């Protein structure tokens, strides 16, 4: 396979959030869909032997948080995906800042009950400085949550970035009915996938089928959805790929990482909206990825995973995709 084709199928993104927003749980659900793991370990309940795959240090297993950046790779629908799972806790932010230098885009995870939090703001500013496209996943809709319009307003006012909801929640917590896909014009009805399982038995209803939709979610939720759709279509920003790529507009998705609801839809929309790695700039101009010289940026050195050091690097140039220097 040629170097050019290898580049085109790659997607490298970081996941950023405030602690406990669900970042590591979302990462594991991505790995489930890529077939990299068969059972997701929730970051809750660390007294058991089941831990999150991206949390490999003993302190991470004990505390249920990420304290170092993990680099995870899997294949999905023809894409080779690299996830940079970054620490959310402020004490370990230096590792996060360095890792963001290697990301082509970022997924910002927000707790629906808490909104934009302190560490999210700090990490967001780093992404803005680097002009990284940012995609927002508003998590934990299966719990009590803030009003979705208020969440959008908070993202825009606090972070200073325009929002474009790609899907829209119907209820929350015990009354969470599902999400409306604004692009596909259908409703995915909520049903949780528990115990780390991959499959979600999702029923999808055409949004124009009023009788069926009312039967599934009830008259009150149906009427509220129609009001929300009308307001969104009239007031929210339209999707603009150039603005997304420039980091001026963030597509917003709602779901629940813990119950695996909305994760696959988010992943597929995300892959369709992102681009393959672009040539990097240096103080001597744009770096040609097809040059014969080898160059890379080492953004992490891990000495604790096993006896041998493992370096994580962003490859700038290489004569061959199978170059032994990079193996």
Task: Label each region the model flagged.
Residues 1-318, 322:
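Structural and coupling elements of P-loop NTPases
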Residues 324-327:
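N-terminal low-complexity segments that are often proline-rich with Ser/Thr-Pro
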């Amino acid at each position: 396979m040629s170097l050019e084709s290898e580049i085109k199928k790659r997607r490298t993104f970081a996941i950023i959030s405030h602690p406990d927003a669900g970042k590591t749980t979302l990462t594991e659900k991505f790995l489930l869909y890529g077939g990299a793991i068969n059972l997701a370990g929730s970051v809750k309940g660390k007294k058991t032997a089941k831990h999150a795959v991206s949390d490999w240090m003993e302190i991470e297993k004990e505390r249920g948080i990420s304290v170092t950046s993990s680099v995870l790779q899997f294949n999905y629908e023809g894409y080779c995906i690299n996830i940079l799972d970054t620490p959310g806790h402020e004490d370990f932010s230096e590792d996060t800042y360095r890792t963001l230098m290697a990301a082509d885009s970022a997924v910002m995870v927000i707790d629906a009950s808490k909104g934009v939090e302190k560490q999210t703001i700090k990490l967001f500013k780093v992404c803005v400085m680097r002009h990284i496209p940012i995609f927002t996943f508003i998590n934990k809709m299966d719990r009590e949550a803030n009003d979705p319009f208020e969440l959008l307003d908070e993202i825009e006012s606090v972070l200073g970035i325009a929002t474009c909801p790609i899907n829209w929640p119907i209820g929350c917590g015990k009354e969470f009915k599902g999400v409306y896909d604004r692009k596909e014009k259908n409703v995915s009805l909520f049903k949780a996938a528990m115990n780390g399982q991959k499959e979600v038995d999702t029923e999808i209803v055409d949004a124009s089928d009023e009788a069926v939709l009312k039967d599934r979610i009830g008259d009150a939720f149906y009427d509220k959805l129609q009001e929300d759709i009308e307001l969104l279509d009239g007031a929210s920003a339209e999707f603009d790929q150039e603005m997304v790529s420039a980091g001026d507009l963030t597509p917003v998705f709602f779901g629940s990482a813990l119950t695996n609801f909305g994760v696959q839809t988010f992943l597929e929309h995300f892959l369709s909206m992102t681009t393959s790695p672009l040539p990097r700039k240096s103080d001597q101009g744009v770096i040609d990825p097809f040059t014969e010289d080898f160059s890379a940026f080492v953004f992490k050195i891990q000495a604790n995973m096993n006896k041998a050091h493992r370096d994580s690097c962003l490859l700038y140039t290489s004569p061959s995709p199978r170059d032994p220097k990079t193996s």
